[in-house]
């Protein structure tokens, strides 16, 4: 079986965006979401740490591209993600995203 990157992104991007929307809505903290996914689902890292690793600018760019192609709200980048990118909080590469990095 061959895995195409677009298929992987079709699953991963909504997962990341859902976690970002939860933080933006005040439903849970970034720490709580990531802890729940690591402890409760045995993921190696939570969705927000993963977004920080990928780069919030990259995550936003992929989401925008997928949204423009499909017009599905599932892929619409959350306002919090766009605010962080605009503020230069791009994740690990800038030392700050959803978590601080030293």
Protein language model regions, located:
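NAD(P)-dependent Rossmann-like dehydrogenase/reductase catalytic/cofactor-binding core
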Residues: 1-7, 13-102
């Amino acid at each position: 079986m061959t895995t195409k990157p677009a298929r992987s992104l079709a699953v991963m991007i909504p997962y990341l965006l859902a976690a970002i929307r939860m933080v933006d809505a005040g439903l849970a903290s970034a720490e709580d979401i990531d802890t729940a996914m690591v402890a409760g689902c045995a993921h190696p890292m939570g969705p927000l740490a993963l977004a920080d690793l990928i780069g919030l600018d990259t995550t936003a760019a992929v989401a925008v591209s997928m949204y423009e192609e499909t017009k599905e709200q599932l892929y619409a980048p959350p306002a919090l993600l766009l605010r962080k990118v605009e503020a230069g909080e791009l994740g690990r590469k800038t030392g700050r995203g959803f978590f601080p990095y030293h």
